[in-house]
């Protein structure tokens, strides 16, 4: 017997950064295309981490409840001065 295929994508973006789909539409398309799980990792700088993650969490929760797919909200930190990377990453983890 062949193992069940599991398909995940942990590096996706929505129109909240440089993607073209809303978070819920990105998730819906992943479900339709047979994905087992997803992470949404929109680009963000030092500002805006908390509002972005709050927005993503809501759609991730809806996806889990309605479609049974685990979706993990995250951020991809971009264009930060090197001295801010550590503290900004900690803020993202704490958010």
Language model features: what each stretch is:
Residues 19-30, 81-91:
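Short, acidic/polar
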Residues 18-19, 46-51, 79-83:
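Acidic-and-aromatic substrate-binding clefts and catalytic sites of carbohydrate-active enzymes
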Residues 1-2, 33-36, 59-63:
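A broad, low-specificity signal for short, low-complexity segments enriched in glycine/proline
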Residues 1, 22, 71:
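Catalytic core of pol beta-like nucleotidyltransferases
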């Amino acid at each position: 017997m062949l193992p069940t295929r599991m398909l995940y994508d942990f590096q996706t973006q929505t129109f909240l950064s440089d993607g073209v789909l809303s978070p819920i539409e990105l998730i819906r398309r992943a479900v339709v295309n047979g994905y087992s799980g997803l992470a949404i990792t929109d680009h963000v700088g030092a500002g805006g981490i908390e509002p972005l993650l709050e927005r993503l969490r809501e759609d991730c929760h809806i996806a889990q409840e309605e479609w049974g797919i685990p979706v993990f909200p995250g951020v991809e930190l971009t264009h930060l001065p090197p001295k801010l990377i550590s503290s900004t990453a900690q803020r993202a983890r704490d958010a």
